[in-house]
Amino acid sequence: MRVGGDLNGQARNWSGSNCRHYDSSKKGITLGENRMQDISKSIEACAARYGEQAAAMRDYLLAGQVAALALDNRGPVEFDDSGKIARHILDAYSKYGFYVFTGVLTEEECEDIEADIIALKASFPVAPDSTVDAEGRPALGSDSLTPHLVWSKPLGDPLGGTQLANGRHQVKMFEPEAAADTPMASPFILLGSLRFSDACLRTYAHPQLLRVAEAINGGDFAPFNEALFIKEPGIGAAVSWHQDGVTHWDSPDFDENIHGFNFMAQLYGSTAVNGVWVLPGSHKLGKIDIKELVSSSKSERIEGAVPLVCDRGDVVICNRQALHGSFPNSGFEPRLTVNFGFHRRSSVLGIKGGGIHSDAQVFDDKIIARRSRVLGYAIAARKERFPEETAYEYKPFTEQSLSFVWDDAARADIHDYNRDDLSI
């Protein structure tokens, strides 16, 4: 097992002593052109659920947000004169393990996603073991052979401290008491999301984002997995601190990008209360002993971590090796994250998968090609919806003279497509 780096030093590098000595009277946070949400009430509501730890939680949330916004890893997707991704973006991504791309999705695209989300929620099963929705119709995914909905009790942490997902969520997060009128369980992850939402499928083919994927993983980059993360106010579950990668920690070719990355497109924005927190620079440190890190921080409030603070339409790129997690959404703002990731082809070709998102299998050229078809359909669907855009040209398709059409036959072809998620 590869373990490296000075984690305590890493924390000091990014946020100094802010986590312990922040003036909690400074509750209003002004950003840019005041586009960000005022989450003062949510911070108070969240902190209040932590009992004797309320003041510490309040200070942590406030300090984390200030520290996040002080980092130089935020701005629009930019290209240099040669058409390549701007060097400062790649450098900041390498330094911190994440970058916030601002204003990527237009309001029109956000509205498309929102309309799909409303329809999807109406078709969710009424309970984890149900196959019908609230109207008695067959529920979303009732004909699926692959996993789709992941449920949790309100404000719970269903993965932390368990052996699920290969035991990568090593610690259990605090689970606040939810209000009496909340449901017994609620969906908080939808897997295989491109099958269920045309709008998310189109976002998957966003040409600027795919150019970023090419810059980091090469022109023959490979798909990973797609999901929606649903963090409803007063309900949304925690995702305990973890690193996504499971396969290459001991590889002789190990480096900071070997496990790929995820894009996280934010429909409603993301805050210190409802958003993902990341320990900057941790993607370079190998596999981390999270229990020891929590112990040294004296709580689940890991020193030096910062939240992904986003506005509507922003998209984060986050390295899958970075230590990250999220607290239960005890605030008043929802978070809906359209999540999709990509790998280097060399990281998956001939490699046996980790078995988290799909059955463990050795990924050969045939499986990678089959899993990549959804990208071809996504590019075609986006071209139809946004004909004024210059569509992305995916090198493996161009080399094989492949073309795709988004129609009913294509829709049938991606049924249960996530059985081939390239999970490493």
Ranges and model annotations:
Residues D38-A54, A63-F79, S123, T131, ...:
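Non-heme Fe(II)/2-oxoglutarate
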Residues N257-F261, Y268-F327, S347:
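Double-stranded beta-helix
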Residues A227, E232, Q243-G245, A265-G269, ...:
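Short, structured patches in soluble enzyme cores that scaffold and shape functional sites
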Residues W241-G260:
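Acidic, His- and aromatic-enriched active-site or binding-groove loops in soluble protein domains
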Residues Q37-K95, T102-W241, T247:
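Non-heme Fe(II)-dependent double-stranded beta-helix
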